[in-house]
Amino acid sequence: MPVTTIAATDVHVDAEGFLTEYDQWDEQLARALAAQIGIDLTDAHWAILRFLRNDYREQGETATLRRVSTQAGVPIKTLFTLFPGKPAKKMAYVAGLPKPHGCV
């Protein structure tokens, strides 16, 4: 796996830049990843990122938009507002998780 430096930290990433090592993620890294895609993290973002990381640890895969909406209680429209364009992909990227299945 390629290694890149983000926020002064060397991290393992896949060909698309998604982290491949769950334990390399921290909040400083999340802020840097979010900044790279033009997102300034708010409390609402952090709640979703924490849900995603906890869910990944329990389920072993990155949650879909539907799962985030139903399990975390965040309307899909809100997810599109917080992570515009491709919310599932952007949420996973910032949360330091693999790209969700079905994302292109």
Across the structure, where does each feature detected by a protein language model lie?
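Pre-recognition alpha-helix immediately N-terminal to the DNA-recognition helix
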Residues: 47-51
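Residues within well-ordered alpha-helical secondary structure of globular protein domains
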Residues: 52-54, 85
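N-terminal first-folded block
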Residues: 4-35
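Helix-rich interaction surfaces within compact, conserved domain-sized segments
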Residues: 13, 65-104
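Noncatalytic partner-interaction/assembly domains of nucleic-acid and motor enzyme complexes
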Residues: 18, 28-43, 56-65, 74, ...
